[in-house]
Amino acid sequence: MAIFKSISSISNPTGSMGSSIGTSNIDGLTNNNNSIACFDSDYSGLNGLGGLGGFNGGGCGGCGDSNTNIINIDIDLCRRGHRCC
């Protein structure tokens, strides 16, 4: 089960969003490197929710395969014609 602490700084000033995730514990895998999940409309919409899969080092790229406690970050990027994952 994914436990996320200190999810902050979600903003959308110019079509890009970043979500800082501090401490996460994903099925026993502890990831505490303040990875960034990138949601950039210039790069196919939501291309960075790889956090629930382990953040792949940097967090930008790839969707995780977990369905536990995802904060619903579908902030109408899909509705702008971009492909989600």
Curated annotation (Swiss-Prot):
Top-level lineage group: Eukaryota
Family the UniProt entry places it in: Belongs to the UPF0512 family.
Protein name as catalogued: UPF0512 protein U
